[in-house]
Regions:
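Class I S-adenosyl-L-methionine
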Residues: 255-303
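General small-molecule cofactor/ligand-binding pocket signal
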Residues: 19, 152-154, 272-274
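Class I S-adenosyl-L-methionine-dependent methyltransferase module
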Residues: 17-19, 24-145, 178, 182-218, ...
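A short helix-to-beta-strand connector/capping loop
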Residues: 144-152
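Conserved SAM/SAH-binding loop
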Residues: 155-160
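Conserved proline-anchored active-site loop of SAM-dependent methyltransferases
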Residues: 1-13, 20-25, 163-184, 240-242
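Conserved Class I SAM-dependent methyltransferase catalytic core
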Residues: 213-269
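A short acidic (Asp/Glu
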Residues: 10-13, 29-33, 164-167, 180-189, ...
Length: 303
């Protein structure tokens, strides 16, 4: 899974050997949580989650409360998020928890944040009515399943590691348009990295210059895809893309044409195209988003 995100596609193949990659640290932690073969002391993690849920951090200020209070969350929630993230990092540095346990707790924190965030589904902006609801509740991730001991998890630019692994199927689901994931999910990435940078503007975003994806840029997307496809070591390449085409908002326009995709995949082998209609995410505002098609381009690799 070359652009794994939170791992929804890879999870459908949980009984197989998985190689997953994403350049965002927040998604990397999710992948470690779901797919890493490292063992977990579930009793220890559950006890920590119970401790965090019952902890009163209302008298403590920290990086999160000082920078994000009364934005995506109220002050009390921000105080708790900051305390949990700092404590988890300290436990990991002390060796009290291993890498996967560390990732499980952070992933649980992200899911808890998403359930009560005062947003429309991402962190590009927040709802400014001051009506915060719900409390932060960390739950144990449901990852008690047998995993392949040869699973590999990467936090990297996909193009830089594509040549390292030999697989049966390489699934590619890159960004479709100019909307950078590091912009929409900057807060989760900030909490994941835990470097406590300065934040700016109403949305409280950190500097994301080094996090931008080439696949979101028209002049670089085709070049990046061709480089990736040439490096992959696999029997099949399954490429997912939609037909956003020309929308009223140019940011939503697809960065790769069908011609680009077929030309590039054909470098490696024969290409078939499968289509399925779907309703794009637009908060119900656009009639143009009702005729979208998800396309799957399947390349049977010959060279």
């Amino acid at each position: 899974d070359v652009f794994s995100g939170t791992g929804s596609v890879a999870s459908a193949f949980i009984d197989k050997r998985l190689v997953v990659c994403d350049m965002m640290r927040s998604n990397y932690y999710a992948a470690l949580c779901w797919f890493s073969p490292e063992s977990i002391d579930y009793k220890k993690v559950e006890e920590l989650l119970c401790y965090y849920n019952s902890y009163d951090a209302s008298s403590e200020e920290n990086y999160v409360s000082e920078n994000f209070s009364e934005t995506y969350f109220n002050r009390i929630t921000c105080q708790k998020i900051g305390f949990i993230r700092e404590n988890v990092e300290n436990l990991y540095k002390l060796g009290t928890i291993n890498a996967r346990e560390h990732a499980c707790i952070i992933t649980s924190l992200f899911y808890a944040m998403d359930r009560i965030s005062h947003t429309c589904g991402h962190y590009d902006s927040f709802i400014r009515d001051g009506k915060y609801e719900g409390c932060l509740e960390l739950r144990m991730p449901e990852n008690r399943y047998v995993l392949n001991c040869e699973n590999k998890i990467y936090c990297s630019d996909s193009n830089s590691i594509a040549h390292l692994e030999e697989v049966d199927v390489a699934y590619l689901d890159p960004p479709y348009n100019s909307r950078q994931y590091c912009d929409a999910y900057h807060l989760l990435e900030n909490i994941a990295l835990w470097e406590k940078p300065e934040v700016h503007g109403v949305a409280k975003k950190m500097d994301r210059t080094d996090m931008k994806s080439k696949y979101c840029k028209s002049i670089k997307a085709a070049e990046a895809l061709e480089d990736l496809v040439k490096k992959l070591r696999c029997r099949y390449i399954l490429f997912s893309y939609n037909n956003n085409g020309k929308k009223l908002q140019c940011r939503s326009n697809a960065k790769l044409t069908d011609e680009d995709i077929i030309r590039i995949l054909s470098i490696r082998g024969d290409v078939q195209v499968f289509t399925m209609n779907y309703r794009g995410f637009d908060a119900g505002k656009s009639e143009l988003n009702k005729d979208n098609q998800e396309r799957l381009f399947l390349c049977s690799v010959r060279k």
